[in-house]
Design a protein with these regions (language model features):
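Sec-dependent signal peptide recognition
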Residues: 2-8
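C-terminal motif of bacterial Sec signal peptides marking the signal peptidase cleavage site
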Residues: 14-17
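Bacterial signal peptide processing site
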Residues: 19-22
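Post-signal peptide N-terminal segment of mature Sec-exported envelope proteins
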Residues: 27-52
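N-terminal small/polar-rich segments of proteins
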Residues: 48-69
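Surface-exposed helix/loop patches within compact recognition domains
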Residues: 69-151, 164
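C-terminal or internal capping secondary-structure element at the end of a domain, subdomain, or sheet
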Residues: 148-189
Length: 189
């Protein structure tokens, strides 16, 4: 779970480091942003398990690991870092900081910083190995994501959702659409 919080913490730094503050020095602004991120980051619920399979041009990539959730800067992220290589991570990002409390369906969209629709989520699959970084992300045509809530347990199963390759990172045959399938279980508490 600490790995998930670290990944979210680093991501939050990237999003807030460019925050405009013309009255302070750059060092003071960065310090203020770091304090804001630290104070707003919290683990949510109890960790479960996740298994994700991504297929691109006949190659299969898998993530098996702990499924956990954190809130930071007003948004919730459910993440599954791989047990054997934590920089290989699947993430679901919500536009609010609330875990699904009842069985719910969300529209998957392309990441938009100004989106505040509580029914929207974004998906990403990232493999940040230094030799061949690969990233795939959802777009506005990816589809729907359903969460089934049964008491304390929250489950999400999906199959054959299409993700778009990052043109910057994915090279050669990996610079193509991919399909992703998975099963996640997380607990409210």
């Amino acid at each position: 779970m600490k790995k998930i919080i670290t990944i979210i913490f680093v991501s939050s730094i990237l999003f807030t480091a460019c925050k405009s503050n013309k009255t302070d020095s750059a060092a003071t602004t960065i310090e203020q942003n770091m304090d804001e991120i630290k104070s707003s980051t919290a683990e949510q619920g109890k960790a479960g398990k996740g298994k994700i399979t991504l297929q691109c041009n006949g190659k299969t990539y898998e993530i098996n690991g702990v499924c956990g959730a954190v809130t930071s800067m007003g948004s919730l992220t459910i993440a599954v870092p791989d047990d054997s290589f934590p920089a290989k991570t699947f993430m679901i990002n919500f536009t609010n900081d609330k875990m699904p409390s009842t069985t719910s369906s969300y529209t998957i969209i392309k990441s938009k910083l100004d989106d505040k629709d509580a029914n929207h989520v974004t998906l990403s699959y990232a493999d940040m190995r230094s030799t061949s970084t690969m990233i795939w992300e959802s777009d506005d045509k990816t589809g729907k994501l359903d969460f089934v809530v049964n008491g304390n347990e929250i489950k999400c199963s999906f199959s054959n959702l299409t993700l778009q390759a990052s043109e910057f990172y994915n090279k050669g045959e990996l610079n193509a659409k991919a399909t992703i399938s998975g099963d996640l279980t997380i607990y409210k508490n």
